[in-house]
Amino acid sequence: MKNNFLDKVKDRLIISCQALADEPLHSSFIMARMARAAYEAGASAIRANSVVDVQAIMDTVELPVIGLDKVDYSDAPIYITPTIKEMRGIAATGAAVVACDVTGRPRPHGEQLATIVETMRTEYPDTLLMADTASLDDVKEANRLGFDIIGTTMYGYTPATEGCNIADNDFEYLKQVLAMSKAPVIAEGKIDSPEKAVTALKLGCHSVVVGSSITRPQLIAKTYIDAVNEL
């Protein structure tokens, strides 16, 4: 039986609490406190990166977690939970959802996404799988492989979609994803205002993930500093 993550996040906000190694808030302790702040604000779930951060957050707040593991490999361009090793590692924490790159690009060591999905279904049957997609072709592939959740996470973050924004052309891309997806859609990626989040939900998204505009203060501060410096 699958877990009840989707029931818990329906029409609600998920907050991403992530800080990479080169960022000032990089610390599992700090991410856990950030998750606590998100919890107190009313977040329905947390999206988090790395086994240690996921575990620290789960030890701190009673919220479901979308877990991922960003790892760079020299033989492949993708980095969000790219191999079965990272998938297993995140699932073993007890995270409700494991998210991974589903952008059609090569995976490290020649691993095949279909094989990874099949293995996860066998070893972690109660764990939901979220496809971090960047294009309609990616959504089709996620449908074919039976992902439980389809995210727009990578739209605007791949070479083919660089510069794209989910709100472009009155959210036309998101509308197409919603029409095509066979699984609940979670809007993610450049949702940088409450208005965008509300629009995504009104269009039919199951829930919305917001990260940088809430939990990355160096980026938030820069928007103010850039505006002031233009005077």
From Swiss-Prot:
Quote the cellular component terms of the Gene Ontology held in the record.
Answer: cytosol
User: Which pathway does this polypeptide act in?
Assistant: Amino-sugar metabolism; N-acetylneuraminate degradation; D-fructose 6-phosphate from N-acetylneuraminate: step 3/5
E.C. number(s) listed in UniProt: 5.1.3.9
The top EC class, named as a word, is isomerase
> Which GO BP terms, alphabetically?
carbohydrate metabolic process; N-acetylmannosamine catabolic process; N-acetylneuraminate catabolic process
Database matches in HAMAP family: ManNAc6P_epimer
Q: What does this protein do?
A: Converts N-acetylmannosamine-6-phosphate (ManNAc-6-P) to N-acetylglucosamine-6-phosphate (GlcNAc-6-P).
PANTHER family of this UniProt entry? N-ACETYLMANNOSAMINE-6-PHOSPHATE 2-EPIMERASE-RELATED
Q: What is this protein called?
A: Putative N-acetylmannosamine-6-phosphate 2-epimerase
Q: Which organism is it from?
A: Latilactobacillus sakei subsp. sakei (strain 23K)
